[in-house]
């Protein structure tokens, strides 16, 4: 029987992203995202909140985008998979489970995010397109949030914004009120 390793998180960053580069030149960005569960305490009848913190790792072009546009407090949607790392420290085995991001959508208003595409609608993925050079060479696209394996056989390389059809509203700068 097939198995599934899929995680979807919507939450807020607890700190600015930390980006570093591997010897190969590929970017790695780590973030911590808080999600809050609200529930009614059965004993007291009071509303309670429980916050969970999630470590998320981005790789390649997606890491560069996350490092550039996400900031502390930013709301973000992330799809990915769980990965557990193991190492030894002082003779003791240590474990850490994190989310390896495959797709990211920046949420919230443009005022809370820096730069173009920071508002709702900044969807990016690892973009493993055929002909795109493999892991880090795919195209990151703004707008709809491309999922893994999509994107056709276009040229790999840098990120490009997907051009939306012209509808005569290019000059409108207002945020949508809902």
Curated annotation (Swiss-Prot):
Transmembrane segments: none annotated. It comes from the Bacteria. Residues 111-159 have a biased composition (Gly residues). CDD domains: SSB_OBF (cd04496). SUPFAM superfamilies: Nucleic acid-binding proteins (SSF50249). One of its GO terms (molecular function) is single-stranded DNA binding. PROSITE patterns: SSB. A motif (Important for interaction with partner proteins) lies at residues 173-178. GO terms for cellular component: nucleoid. InterPro entries: NA-bd_OB-fold (IPR012340), Primosome_PriB/ssb (IPR000424), ssDNA-bd (IPR011344). The keyword DNA repair applies. GO terms for biological process: DNA recombination; DNA repair; DNA replication. Residues 109-178 are annotated as: Disordered. Residues 4-108 form the SSB domain. HAMAP family: SSB. PANTHER family: SINGLE-STRANDED DNA-BINDING PROTEIN. Homotetramer. Plays an important role in DNA replication, recombination and repair. Binds to ssDNA and to an array of partner proteins to recruit them to their sites of action during DNA metabolism. This is Single-stranded DNA-binding protein. It comes from Ralstonia nicotianae (strain ATCC BAA-1114 / GMI1000) (Ralstonia solanacearum).
């Amino acid at each position: 029987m097939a198995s599934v390793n899929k995680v979807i998180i919507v939450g807020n960053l607890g700190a600015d992203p930390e980006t570093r580069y591997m010897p190969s030149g590929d970017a790695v960005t780590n973030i911590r995202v808080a999600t809050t569960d609200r529930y009614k305490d059965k004993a007291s009848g009071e509303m309670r909140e429980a916050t969970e913190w999630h470590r998320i790792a981005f790789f390649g072009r997606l890491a560069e985008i996350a490092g550039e546009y996400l900031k502390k407090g930013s709301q973000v949607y992330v799809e990915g998979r769980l990965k557990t790392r193991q190492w030894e420290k002082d003779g003791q085995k240590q474990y850490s489970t994190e989310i390896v991001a495959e797709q990211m959508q920046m949420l919230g208003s443009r005022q809370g995010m820096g730069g173009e595409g920071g508002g709702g609608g900044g969807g990016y993925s690892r973009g493993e397109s055929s002909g795109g050079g493999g892991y880090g060479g795919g195209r990151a696209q703004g707008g709809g949030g491309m999922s893994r394996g999509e994107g056709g056989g276009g040229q790999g390389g840098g990120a490009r914004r997907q051009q939306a059809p012209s509808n005569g509203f290019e000059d409108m700068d207002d945020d949508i009120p809902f």
